[in-house]
Amino acid sequence: GLIDVRCYASRECWEPCRKVTGSGQAKCQNNQCRCY
């Protein structure tokens, strides 16, 4: 789901999402990170 991390590129979300979900699968959606 969405996490409270601002972004411009999906790769900016990989590390934050890995910390939250343990998975590096992420997308930047409407300038906010979404983890899968």
UniProtKB/Swiss-Prot annotation:
User: Its family?
Assistant: Belongs to the short scorpion toxin superfamily. Potassium channel inhibitor family. Alpha-KTx 16 subfamily.
What pairs make up the disulfide bonds? C7-C28, C13-C33, C17-C35
Q: Site: Basic residue of the functional dyad. Where?
A: K27
Instruction: Provide the species name.
Output: Buthus paris
Enumerate the Pfam families for this protein: Toxin_2 (PF00451)
Q: What is its main location?
A: secreted
Please explain the role this protein plays, according to its UniProt record: Poorly competes with (125)I-kaliotoxin binding on rat brain synaptosome (IC(50)>100 nM). Is a poor Kv1.3/KCNA3 ligand. May have as real target KCa1.1/KCNMA1 channel. Shows weak toxicity on mice.
Which tissue types show expression of this protein?
Expressed by the venom gland.
Task: Identify the domain of life.
Answer: Eukaryota
For the site labelled Aromatic residue of the functional dyad, the residues are Y36
Q: How are the domains described in the entry?
A: Has the structural arrangement of an alpha-helix connected to a beta-sheet by disulfide bonds (CSalpha/beta).
The cellular component terms of Gene Ontology attached to this UniProt record, alphabetical and capped at eight, are:
extracellular region
Q: Which PROSITE patterns match?
A: SCORP_SHORT_TOXIN (PS01138)
Annotated keywords: Calcium-activated potassium channel impairing toxin, Disulfide bond, Ion channel impairing toxin, Neurotoxin, Potassium channel impairing toxin, Secreted, Toxin
Question: Which compartment or compartments is the protein found in?
Answer: Secreted
* Tagged with keyword Cytoplasm: no
Q: What is this protein called?
A: Potassium channel toxin alpha-KTx 16.9
Q: What are the protein's GO molecular function terms?
A: ion channel inhibitor activity; potassium channel regulator activity; toxin activity
